[in-house]
């Protein structure tokens, strides 16, 4: 069978949920026994999002091979079994950089290098390459970032037009659009969607399926109108209403409307019935939880919805595994009082606290005092990346007695550099793509909470950092009750730390949130939630 290609574009406005829709479609196709490969094309000129502010871009999702990618790849991972790598995300910056390097090398033999055909050819090659990451890929699902009509998106849309023409019997175009509801008029308006489709048709792309993001149910009359003016079959007008309970409703809702069957019909793919009972069970747990646990997130970017997207989702997965509902409280670390009593009052009401990764000194002390509170009050604490470094420095200052302990990231001249720059990072000039990135093997110490969670002596986790725990202080810290529970294979670098005689206080240098699924929660998030439930019951008796 020839490989099929599905292109998903967006119209009217951004942030409609193309990534979620793409992931949900990928899941449904996999349930039909198809092998799916996912690709995100981003029109921005950055080579990757690694140096972009979380306030602008949201989180940076890291793959096993060390690619810093768009957060939509996190959705792909959580919903599908698609293999994700550097080939799963391409930006304008990468594509232009590749073409310019070839021109400098003389690969174009003196030709004038242009957007068409050189840039568009490179885009098409990236699409083909994505389908070759693994053998026997049946469907390549390509999400195009941005909105129809954006100047930055034009080369990508032109490349898709050409690709669809070249593979006309093996391509499908899905357009995700917004159908607004005007409360004052009490009406749903289809005109923005009509114009969005007109933009695509003017480029030469003719959508086969229209997915309509909306706040209210669309009447048959509205769907008929969209079908008529957008020139698609009535069955191909799919409603994607705001979810009531969870984003994990999306694949179930799309399946009920038959989008997976329609895709298989249009692409002449096998169309067996599918079993979504696992996802139905997840939704049932969300609707009828045993109870509620509350986690406090103490970080720099907590007010941005997507800055810690994978962390929030992984916590939800852990709660689902226990049959509980998760409530999240967000605390901006730089605004927390540093007095212990005032801090306890400010962040009270949580069953556990998580300090996620981040860069920069802002909020550093607020995080340290949060870790101190958790250690002293025996409250569950989970530190990720910088959160582990916070835990180490707090322990060094307040337990070991190294009052000047710090990270050289914030105080290069500290007399007690408990956290220091990785040796391979010294002397680097560029910021982009130069951190320790991707999957590394970690050896776990027996009889630790980390070992109990993983039930394995060796694990693989993904990294994104420049600084590490300084082994000069290891013996001194361990004598005081600091446990190095996991180390980098072949080296003695601290990957996991625990506090002895604490119910659950763990810090990890890696990013476990990148390897958690609703159907397969990460063991550390699962056990963190369990520790929170135990703490909640000890405080409230239920």
UniProtKB/Swiss-Prot annotation:
Domain Glutamine amidotransferase type-1 residues, every copy: 301-538
SUPFAM superfamilies for the chain: Class I glutamine amidotransferase-like, P-loop containing nucleoside triphosphate hydrolases
One example of a Gene Ontology biological process annotation: 'de novo' CTP biosynthetic process
InterPro entries xrefs: Class_I_gatase-like, CTP_synthase, CTP_synthase_N, GATASE, GATase1_CTP_Synthase, P-loop_NTPase
Catalyzed chemical reaction(s): UTP + L-glutamine + ATP + H2O = CTP + L-glutamate + ADP + phosphate + 2 H(+); L-glutamine + H2O = L-glutamate + NH4(+); UTP + NH4(+) + ATP = CTP + ADP + phosphate + 2 H(+)
CDD domains (alphabetical): CTPS_N, GATase1_CTP_Synthase
Protein name: CTP synthase
Further comment found in the protein's record: CTPSs have evolved a hybrid strategy for distinguishing between UTP and CTP. The overlapping regions of the product feedback inhibitory and substrate sites recognize a common feature in both compounds, the triphosphate moiety. To differentiate isosteric substrate and product pyrimidine rings, an additional pocket far from the expected kinase/ligase catalytic site, specifically recognizes the cytosine and ribose portions of the product inhibitor.
Role summary: Catalyzes the ATP-dependent amination of UTP to CTP with either L-glutamine or ammonia as the source of nitrogen. Regulates intracellular CTP levels through interactions with the four ribonucleotide triphosphates.
Active site location: 385 (nucleophile), 511, 513
Species for this entry: Protochlamydia amoebophila (strain UWE25)
Inhibition and activation profile: Allosterically activated by GTP, when glutamine is the substrate; GTP has no effect on the reaction when ammonia is the substrate. The allosteric effector GTP functions by stabilizing the protein conformation that binds the tetrahedral intermediate(s) formed during glutamine hydrolysis. Inhibited by the product CTP, via allosteric rather than competitive inhibition.
Positions bound to UTP: 14, 189-194, 225
Family the UniProt entry places it in: Belongs to the CTP synthase family.
EC number: 6.3.4.2
Residues annotated as binding CTP: 14, 150-152, 189-194, 225
Gene3D superfamilies (alphabetical): 3.40.50.880, P-loop containing nucleotide triphosphate hydrolases
Subunit architecture: Homotetramer.
Enzyme class: ligase
Binding locations of ATP: 15-20, 72, 241-243
One Gene Ontology term, aspect cellular component: cytosol
Keywords: ATP-binding, Glutamine amidotransferase, Ligase, Magnesium, Metal-binding, Nucleotide-binding, Pyrimidine biosynthesis
GO molecular function: ATP binding; CTP synthase activity; glutaminase activity; identical protein binding; metal ion binding
Residue sites binding Mg(2+) per the record: 72, 143
């Amino acid at each position: 069978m020839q490989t099929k290609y599905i292109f998903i574009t967006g119209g009217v406005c951004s942030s409609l949920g193309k990534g979620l829709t793409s992931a949900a479609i990928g899941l449904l196709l996999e349930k039909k026994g198809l092998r799916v490969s996912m690709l995100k094309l981003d029109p921005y000129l950055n080579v990757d999002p690694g140096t972009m502010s979380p306030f602008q871009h949201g989180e940076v999702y890291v793959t096993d091979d060390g690619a810093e990618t768009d957060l939509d790849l996190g959705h792909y991972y959580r919903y599908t079994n698609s293999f994700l790598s550097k080939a799963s995300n391409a930006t304008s910056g990468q594509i232009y950089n590749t073409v310019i390097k070839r021109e400098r090398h003389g690969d174009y033999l003196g030709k004038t290098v242009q957007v068409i055909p050189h840039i568009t050819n490179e885009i098409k090659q990236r699409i083909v390459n994505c389908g070759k990451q693994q053998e026997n890929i049946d469907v390549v699902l390509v999400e195009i970032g941005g909105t129809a009509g954006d100047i930055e998106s034009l080369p990508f849309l032109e490349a898709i037009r050409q690709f669809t023409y070249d593979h006309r019997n093996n391509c499908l175009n899905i357009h995700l659009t917004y159908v607004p509801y005007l409360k004052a008029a009490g009406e749903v308006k289809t005109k923005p969607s009509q114009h969005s489709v007109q933009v695509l048709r003017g480029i030469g792309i003719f959508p086969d399926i229209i997915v309509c993001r909306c706040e209210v149910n669309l009447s048959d009359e509205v769907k008929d109108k969209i079908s008529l003016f957008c020139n698609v079959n009535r069955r191909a007008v799919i409603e994607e209403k705001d979810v009531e309970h969870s984003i994990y409703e999306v694949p179930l809702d799309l399946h009920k409307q038959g989008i997976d069957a329609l895709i298989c019909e249009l692409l002449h793919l096998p169309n067996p019935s599918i079993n979504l009972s696992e996802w139905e069970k997840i939704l049932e747990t969300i609707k009828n939880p045993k109870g509620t646990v509350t986690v406090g997130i103490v970080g720099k970017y907590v007010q941005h919805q997507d800055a810690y997207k994978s962390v929030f989702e992984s916590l939800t997965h852990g709660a689902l595994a226990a049959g509980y509902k998760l409530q999240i409280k967000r605390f901006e670390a730089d605004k927390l009082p540093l007095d212990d009593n005032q801090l306890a009052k400010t962040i009270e009401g949580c069953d556990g606290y998580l300090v996620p990764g981040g860069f920069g000194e802002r909020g550093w002390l607020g995080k340290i005092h949060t870790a101190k509170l958790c250690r002293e009050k025996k409250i569950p604490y989970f530190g990720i990346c910088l959160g582990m470094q916070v835990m180490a420095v707090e322990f060094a200052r307040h337990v070991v007695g190294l009052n000047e302990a710090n990270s050289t990231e914030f105080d290069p001249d500290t007399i007690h550099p408990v956290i220091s720059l990785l040796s391979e990072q010294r002397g680097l000039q560029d910021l982009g793509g130069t951190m320790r990135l991707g999957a590394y093997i970690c050896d776990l110490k027996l009889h630790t909470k980390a070992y109990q969670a993983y039930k394995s002596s060796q694990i693989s986790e993904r990294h994104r950092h420049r600084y590490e725990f300084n082994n000069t202080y290891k013996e001194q810290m361990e004598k005081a009750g600091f446990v190095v529970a996991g180390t980098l294979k072949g080296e003695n670098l601290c990957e996991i730390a625990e506090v002895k005689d604490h119910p659950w206080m763990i810090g990890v240098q890696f990013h476990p949130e990148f390897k958690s699924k609703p159907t397969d929660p990460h063991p550390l998030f699962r056990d963190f939630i369990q520790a929170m439930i135990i703490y909640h019951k000890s405080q409230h008796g239920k």
